[in-house]
Amino acid sequence: QDLPGTDNSTATLCLGHHAVPNGTIVKTITDDQIEVTNATELVQSSSTGKICNNPHKILDGIDCTLIDALLGDPHCDVFQDETWDLFVERSNAFSNCYPYDVPDYASLRSLVASSGTLEFITEGFTWTGVTQNGGSNACKRGPANGFFSRLNWLTKSGSTYPVLNVTMPNNDNSDKLYIWGVHHPSTNQEQTNLYVQASGRVTVSTKRSQQTMIPNAGSRPWVRGLSSRISIYWTIVKPGDILVINSNGNLIAPRGYFKMRTGKSSIMRSDAPIGTCSSECITPNGSIPNDKPFQNVNKITYGACPKYVKQNTLKLATGMRNVPEKQTRGLFGAIAGFIENGWEGMIDGWYGFRHQNSEGTGQAADLKSTQAAIDLINGKVNRVIEKTNEKFHQIEKEFSEVEGRIQDLEKYVEDTKIDLWSYNADVLVALENQHTIDLTDSEMNKLFEKTRRQLRENAEDMGNGCFKIYHKCDNACIESIRNGTYDHDIYRDEALNNRFQIKGVELKSGYKDWILWISFAISCFLLCVVLLGFIMWACQRGNIRCNICI
């Protein structure tokens, strides 16, 4: 189908942008649902299902907790002197030694996890007048009774348990972590059988701190055949400080110290398998890519991870506003420029031209405006990632039962942070999408105005994104318009002449239409006058009688 008003002496040039049959809905500041040609998902909503062992060093706890590995539970001896970036605790981990409790379990666990090492240095403590290396059938090491390898259970020697007073200075340049404990017998009889005194006492001091613990004899729930317990405590000795241990019974003594390191190591509870792969970000669900700025896989993360948000999806527009082409038009059909809809047939650029002239029809992309839009949009995802990625990890928070109110407050703070970031993410993406759509619309308008300035009075803006060119414009002429080398002065006289001729025809055609309408109106008027005159004449002659009743 030819373009209206197109013959060999004129041409039609339309400007437009590409479109797709099915676009993607995104959100902007002004519109919750606007269709664009292309968009990128910004929320990572799934994991790989496994924890990648690269680039972070992962230590699989298997069936040991970190504290059991620290104390030296016999079934955790494989972890002696190990190091890690992330220690993974499993849900099936269990203790298999003397029953114990750690009054400040969460703090000790976090402290050791962040240190990233179980490197242990044995020291020569001198324990005079007592029996060392106590063991229990609840803590088998092979067929023999055993105990925690990093602790030394001291009991009476013969019938005496003297007062112990031992010192150990820290002459190193790093902090030392000492683990020690207090034994709580199940009965008073057990107390005197092991330590002679009816009540023991343990005091551990440094220049900065002092801890004094009194054992509590009494029966407790049976665990691995025992109703007695050990309470585990810890002390950090700074460089130049000194450790002092004083006791008259019930002491579970240290055998040495753990080296303390500073770093960003951590611990995570997860049952995801460890696989051979590479990922910077780890969650309890498994590793996730960090090529997106947001994720809703898990709140707990380790490494350089996307920010956790509540949304399942946030789409960033990376294409222009999509206005699908009306399929009934054909290539040109009834003229269609960018004002009406996009062009689905244009695949080699975002913006372009369609023309019809004496040589036929054609289409070409405008690469300059296309590249300008692409350059401005490229890097949007990376810029959003830079604004939102956490270069640190979100650790698990643990609190004892007596710290329930602190735990509630911590949960409230974390939930508030998530709500805030979810809102920020929504606004950030909406702003970026608005900017993208405005930007791509602007490039289309720039191209249209550039073409208008070239053609000047040689063409007429048809109001729909097309120009009617009033001179013969072959393919070379069309190409000059596209590449900006068109000289309107060359065609000015021809265009002016053709414009008057075409407008004159349109004017005569317009007068004819007016005459027809006026003739029709006069004929109707005369018919009404004749009919009215006949009725009045008939009434006067008596042929028609008209009665009016009130």
Curated annotation (Swiss-Prot):
Residue positions of covalent lipid attachment, annotated as S-palmitoyl cysteine: C539, C546, C549
Modifications after synthesis and translation: Palmitoylated.
Keyword terms, alphabetized: Clathrin- and caveolin-independent endocytosis of virus by host, Clathrin-mediated endocytosis of virus by host, Disulfide bond, Fusion of virus membrane with host endosomal membrane, Fusion of virus membrane with host membrane, Glycoprotein, Hemagglutinin, Host cell membrane, Host membrane, Host-virus interaction, Lipoprotein, Membrane, Palmitate, Transmembrane, Transmembrane helix, Viral attachment to host cell, Viral envelope protein, Viral penetration into host cytoplasm, Virion, Virus endocytosis by host, Virus entry into host cell
TM stretches of this protein: 515-535
Residues annotated as site: Cleavage: R329, G330
Gene Ontology biological process: clathrin-dependent endocytosis of virus by host cell; fusion of virus membrane with host endosome membrane; fusion of virus membrane with host plasma membrane; virion attachment to host cell
Main location: virion
InterPro entries (UniProt xref): Capsid_hemagglutn, Hemagglutn_HA1_a/b_dom_sf, Hemagglutn_influenz_A, Hemagglutn_influenz_A/B
GO cellular component: host cell plasma membrane; membrane; viral envelope; virion membrane
Membrane topology: Single-pass type I membrane protein
Places the protein is found: Virion membrane; Host apical cell membrane
Positions in the Extracellular compartment: 1-514
Glycosylation sites: N8, N22, N38, N165, N285, N483
Topology Cytoplasmic: residue spans: 536-550
Gene Ontology molecular-function annotations: host cell surface receptor binding
Cystine bridges: C14-C466, C52-C277, C64-C76, C97-C139, C281-C305, C473-C477
Additional notes on this entry: Major glycoprotein, comprises over 80% of the envelope proteins present in virus particle.
Biological role stated in the UniProt entry: Binds to sialic acid-containing receptors on the cell surface, bringing about the attachment of the virus particle to the cell. This attachment induces virion internalization either through clathrin-dependent endocytosis or through clathrin- and caveolin-independent pathway. Plays a major role in the determination of host range restriction and virulence. Class I viral fusion protein. Responsible for penetration of the virus into the cell cytoplasm by mediating the fusion of the membrane of the endocytosed virus particle with the endosomal membrane.
UniProt record similarity statement: Belongs to the influenza viruses hemagglutinin family.
HAMAP family for this protein: INFV_HEMA
Subunit structure: Homotrimer of disulfide-linked HA1-HA2.
Name of this protein: Hemagglutinin
Organism from which the protein derives: Influenza A virus (strain A/Swine/Hong Kong/81/1978 H3N2)
Source species taxonomy: Viruses, Riboviria, Orthornavirae, Negarnaviricota, Polyploviricotina
